[in-house]
A protein has these predicted regions:
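Low-complexity, serine/threonine/proline-enriched polar segments
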Residues: 23-126
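Beta-propeller blade signature
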Residues: 1-3
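Eukaryotic short linear interaction motifs
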Residues: 8-10, 25-27, 164-166
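Solvent-exposed serine/threonine-rich low-complexity stretches and specific carbohydrate-binding patches
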Residues: 14-25
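Acidic, glycine-anchored loop motifs typical of Ca2+
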Residues: 5-14, 192
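Ser/Thr/Pro-rich, low-complexity mucin-like regions
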Residues: 125-190
Length: 192
């Protein structure tokens, strides 16, 4: 979240993270950066026969922790995966990366379960689970993890906090259709 401290109506002031249940856990990676690369025009797909995966090497990525990989393309999502509205052949995101929460319960790649984090993350619990699917700006921390007091938030940014693939389901991604300002005065959600 960010406050428009300079009053120019642009999200160019300091951003603060809302520290959810995983923020202080040792397996959480802070200051994580990942760069995705546009698939070259002459790319030859590498499918896995008799599966929904149509290209195992579709979009290359590299992270600042030294890990590398590919976003696989599957037959359920035929659109381009790389943003077509940018001119650059690479796009970089930075933030906090949570530990994987997807388990292949079948052991053969046919049944993935994404187990919910306890609280404080979008697209994580059903909406009716109010204490776990809402946010509180009292959880705001600065880039060093120090709590900060905010009187409000003018800008809100939501991003996918994991880097994991679930086989035929594809890459785990946050899907959000709306947000609502509830101005909750009392909360049973614990502060980190």
């Amino acid at each position: 979240v960010a406050l428009d401290r300079n009053g120019n109506g642009l999200p160019d002031d300091e951003w603060y993270e809302l520290a959810g249940s995983e923020y202080h856990k040792p397996e959480t990676a802070h200051n994580y950066t990942i760069t995705y690369y546009r698939t070259p025009a002459d790319h030859v797909a590498t499918p896995i026969p008799q599966t929904p995966i149509t290209d195992t090497s579709y979009i290359a990525w590299i992270a600042n922790d030294g890990s590398t990989g590919y976003i696989e393309k599957n037959s359920y999502h035929r659109q381009e995966y790389f943003p077509q509205w940018i001119d650059s052949d690479e796009i970089t995101f930075s933030g906090t990366r949570l530990a994987h929460n997807a388990i292949d319960e079948s052991g053969i790649g046919s049944y993935y379960v994404l187990y919910a984090y306890d609280w404080g993350y979008a697209d994580n619990h059903p909406n009716e689970v109010e204490d776990k699917s809402c946010f509180n700006i009292d959880w705001a921390v600065d880039q060093d993890g120090n709590p900060v007091h905010l009187d409000g938030a003018d800008f809100i940014r939501v991003f996918t906090g994991v880097n994991q693939s679930c086989g035929w389901l594809g890459e785990t991604s946050t899907e959000l259709c709306r947000a609502e300002d509830l101005h909750i005065e009392l909360s049973t959600i614990p502060n980190p």
